Amino acid sequence: MGRLKTLDEWLNWQENLHTQEIDLGLERIQEVYKKLFPGGVPFQVITIAGTNGKGSTIAFIDSIYQQSDFKVGAFTSPHLIKYNERFSVNGEMASDESICQAFDAIETLRGETSLTYFEFSTLAALVIFAHEKVDVVVLEVGLGGRLDSVNIVNPNVSIITNIAIDHTDYLGDTREAIGFEKAGIMRSDTLCICGDQNPPTSIQKQADNIGALLLFINEPYQGNITLKGEHQQHNAALAIEAVNQLQLTLPIDKNQLSIGLEKANILARFQVKTVNNKTIVLDVAHNEAAIKVLAETLKAEKVPTLAIFSALKDKNIELMISSIESCIDEWLIVPLSVNRAISTQDLIEKFSLSSKITICKDMASALHQALNTQQQRVVVFGSFHTVADAMKILDKY
């Protein structure tokens, strides 16, 4: 391999190195991890799995620790605009240089072991955080839990936010099967915090099988937060319990905890922008459960609403639409330039006959039309790609 210099060169090379984009299993990445960290990672670890709410829960934890003057690293996925978003230290995303240096360190030790794009990302996150000498790291599971690459690290505490039907090709098509996969992040004699209000029995069974400690959180946080939606109070409660579990190592003052929760913010989770006197809501809700939550938040303010929507073909799109259509007066459908996207023609067939739908040639024309419509509110949702496309254009307004 010739010397790779830029981040784009590294990422293009990784995509071709291991052509199977998703290749679940820990054997390959474990080999390289042990070479990089023979004694384990030098920081506290919180691992977060769950169908929805992971990013918001991480935002709460991140903000609490920053407010308390601890150095915190967060590894999240997918990114919205820039790959570097996946690695943050005290809220600042990693530079191209630091990511390339991490990739270089991995490549030096990798040998003949083939790694996927996501496995490279996971190892790079750990290398970056170790180099930055962070106190605590929050790792977001990319898919499932049991066989996801972040599961090479033994967490000091883990969180399962909730269980809903998603990624059925990989995780199974029942909540019990998906719960089993998420429960794979648990460890014996280590606490796992679960926020699901009706948890599948597979989570408790797995905890019993391995001797993990399991705590169910049912009561939402009652304090002030900036993030909108009742579900965010539940996410905040999970974050509080996680930082409380690490109090001996990373002591948090109650006042700093409250301030951290209130300051927490995250892109594209009912993110509200005002453009040309129109309210625009950006939300990465991309499955039935998340869209139901989005609908509940929209219902808090009953105003004429236009949706800009697109989705991936492996989702249950009929249920996604039916979960929110009572809140939407008009739909603008946009194409996505990713392989997994459903075509606009196939997408239209998922709607009821009474829906008012317009196909737009791209996101720019959809936003132009939305900003000149009679509807007071515009909501952009359906996938990370949909929202990312909108954000790139709205940044120019």
Tell where the protein language model's regions lie, with residue ranges:
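Nucleotide phosphate-binding/pyrophosphate-handling subdomain across enzymes
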Residues: 131, 136-141, 149-159, 163-167, ...
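Hydrophobic anchor at the beta1->P-loop junction of P-loop NTPases
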Residues: 46-48
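C-terminal helical cap/extension that packs against the catalytic core
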Residues: 193, 197-215, 279-280, 288, ...
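Conserved catalytic-core segment of NTP-binding enzymes
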Residues: 145-147, 154-211, 318
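A glycine-rich beta-strand to alpha-helix segment
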Residues: 365-395
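ATP-dependent carboxylate-amine ligase catalytic core
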Residues: 9, 20-21, 26, 30-41, ...
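Hydrophobic positions on the alpha1 helix immediately C-terminal to the Walker A/P-loop
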Residues: 56-60
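Charged, amphipathic alpha-helical linker segments immediately N-terminal to NTP-binding catalytic cores
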Residues: 1-20
